[in-house]
């Protein structure tokens, strides 16, 4: 766990709350790259659960807003800022669809993840009151995310953000992109991240996986080769 020194006790430490740490990292990244970026996008470690339950979470927030001052609600923790931003982005995904279709290189990375990881497509369809339904479609049929594997539900938010939101010079922050992925699939995720970097996206990741870290390190070493040499070793010019 990340720690900070307590001013009252020179040699003692106390843990930094996870939400505060995330806010600090995001603020540092935005301050550092702010002059070069269009928008920062953050994919929290809890992205799978939030995406599966986004309707219930948004509905609860709307209900509390419309009944404020009329009903008393039990005290519950507020969403951290980055989680609230993630939820807002999910709700507005369909509205951004047309604008981001022109960014071909980045949506192509979303298609790469669908081809090599999810083995099916992630769709957005207008639901009741035009609230988006997020669905998974493969050869067996069409399913809501809560009926898919943990791997699909973890990768789905990445696919959606790449297809509809992230653009060149954006900052994309992903917590634990290797979560619920087999080592071979971790390699494919690392490949996707490299493709994003080559498309002009600034990517910041946190990871607990030595295997995933090693894959990224291999790609850094690979970047020292010429494009011709990379292709001769079985890699594309985007790797």
Language model regions located:
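Phosphate-coordinating catalytic segments in nucleotide- and nucleic-acid-processing enzymes
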Residues: 1-169, 199, 239
């Amino acid at each position: 766990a990340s720690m900070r020194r307590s001013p009252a006790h020179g040699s003692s430490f106390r843990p930094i709350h996870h939400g505060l740490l995330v806010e600090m990292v995001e603020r540092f990244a935005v301050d550092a790259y702010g002059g070069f970026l269009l928008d920062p996008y953050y994919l929290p470690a809890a992205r799978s659960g939030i995406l599966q339950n986004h309707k219930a979470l948004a509905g609860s927030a709307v209900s509390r807003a419309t009944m404020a001052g009329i009903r008393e609600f039990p005290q519950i923790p507020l969403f951290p800022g980055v989680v609230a931003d993630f939820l807002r982005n999910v709700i507005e995904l369909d509205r951004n669809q047309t604008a981001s279709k022109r960014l071909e290189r980045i949506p192509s990375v979303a298609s790469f993840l669908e081809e090599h990881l999810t083995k099916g497509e992630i769709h957005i369809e207008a639901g009741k009151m035009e609230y988006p339904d997020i669905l998974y479609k493969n050869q067996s049929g069409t399913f809501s995310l809560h009926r898919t594997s943990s791997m699909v539900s973890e990768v789905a938010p990445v696919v959606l953000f790449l297809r509809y939101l992230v653009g060149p010079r954006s900052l994309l922050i992903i917590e634990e992109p290797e979560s619920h992925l087999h080592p071979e699939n971790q390699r494919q995720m690392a490949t996707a991240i490299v493709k994003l970097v080559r498309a002009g996206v600034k990517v910041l990741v946190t990871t607990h996986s030595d295997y995933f870290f090693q894959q990224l390190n291999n790609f850094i070493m690979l970047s020292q080769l010429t494009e011709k040499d990379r292709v001769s070793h079985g890699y594309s010019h985007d790797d």
